[in-house]
Design a protein with these regions (language model features):
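Glycine-rich, small/hydroxylated-residue low-complexity segments
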Residues: 1-221
C-alpha cells in the first residue's frame, strides 16, 4: 500500500498578464488574499480540496467594449476520485462553491442597460458524490483499456449518485436541491442502453416570477 498527504497555504498573491498583437491587446489580473490546498493519495483514491479568499478577476481588451471586473469573497473546489481497480464500490465526488460574487456595475449595465435586474451578490454551492466500481486502474493509461470498454474514456460503473447540496442565489431568486438515485446496471433496456435509475431529486425554486417579469421588461424574453 501507499499513502501520500500534502497541504500548503499561500498569502496574498496575483498574476498579471499583457499580450499585444496586430489585432489588439489583452491584459488581465488574477488575485486573492490567501489560499489553501490539501490533497491525499491512497489506495482509496485521490482527494483534492482548494480554498481561496477575496478573489479578483479583471480582463480588458481593445476589442471589448467594457472591461470584465469580477470579485468574490471566497471560493472552493475539490474532488474525490478512485484510482485503483476494485470490484466493490468506491467513493467519488465533486465540490464547488463561491460566495458574494460581484460583477462590476459597468459590465452589468452592458447586460442590463435599464437597470431592471438586481446586480447583487451571487452565491453558489454544490456538493455531489457517489459510488462506482472502477473496472481498470486509472494510473494505467493503456489505449486498449478504452477499446475494451467501448471507447468509454473512463472505465467505470456508477452504482449510486447523491446530490448532497445545491444552493444557488442570484438576481432575487434562489434554487435549492438534494436527492439521490441508485443505478441498476443490470437493466439496460428500460432506458435504451442506460442503467435504470431508482430514486428522486427534490428542488425548491423561489423568486422566479419576479425575475421573469424583469426579464420581460428588459427585453430578454
Amino acid at each position: 500500500g501507499y499513502n501520500a498527504l500534502g497541504s500548503y497555504s499561500v498569502g496574498a498573491g496575483s498574476i498579471e498578464f499583457d499580450f499585444s498583437s496586430p489585432d489588439g491587446n489583452l491584459e488581465g489580473k488574477l488575485a486573492s488574499e490567501n489560499s489553501n490546498v490539501s490533497s491525499s493519495l491512497t489506495q482509496n483514491g485521490l482527494l483534492f480540496d482548494a480554498y481561496f479568499a477575496n478573489g479578483l478577476f479583471k480582463l480588458s481588451s481593445s476589442v471589448m467594449p467594457i472591461p470584465v471586473d469580477i470579485s468574490l469573497k471566497n471560493g472552493n473546489y475539490g474532488f474525490t476520485v478512485p484510482i485503483l481497480k476494485q470490484m466493490q464500490s468506491q467513493n467519488f465526488g465533486l465540490r464547488l462553491g463561491f460566495s458574494d460574487l460581484q460583477i462590476a456595475q459597468d459590465l452589468w449595465e452592458l447586460l442590463d442597460p435599464n437597470n431592471n435586474l438586481k446586480n447583487g451578490p451571487i452565491n453558489a454551492k454544490i456538493a455531489f458524490s457517489g459510488k462506482a466500481k472502477l473496472l481498470e486502474n486509472l494510473i494505467e493509461l493503456r489505449p486498449d483499456i478504452y477499446e475494451d470498454n467501448n471507447l468509454n474514456p473512463i472505465p467505470f460503473e456508477v452504482d449510486e449518485m447523491f446530490l448532497e447540496k445545491l444552493d444557488l442565489s442570484l438576481m432575487g431568486t434562489s434554487l435549492q436541491g438534494e436527492g439521490s438515485v441508485s443505478l441498476d446496471n443490470e437493466d439496460l433496456t428500460t432506458f435504451a442502453g442506460f442503467p435504470k435509475p431508482v430514486g428522486s431529486f427534490e428542488f425548491v425554486l423561489s423568486g422566479v416570477n419576479g425575475l421573469v417579469d424583469k426579464l420581460i421588461s428588459s427585453g430578454f424574453i
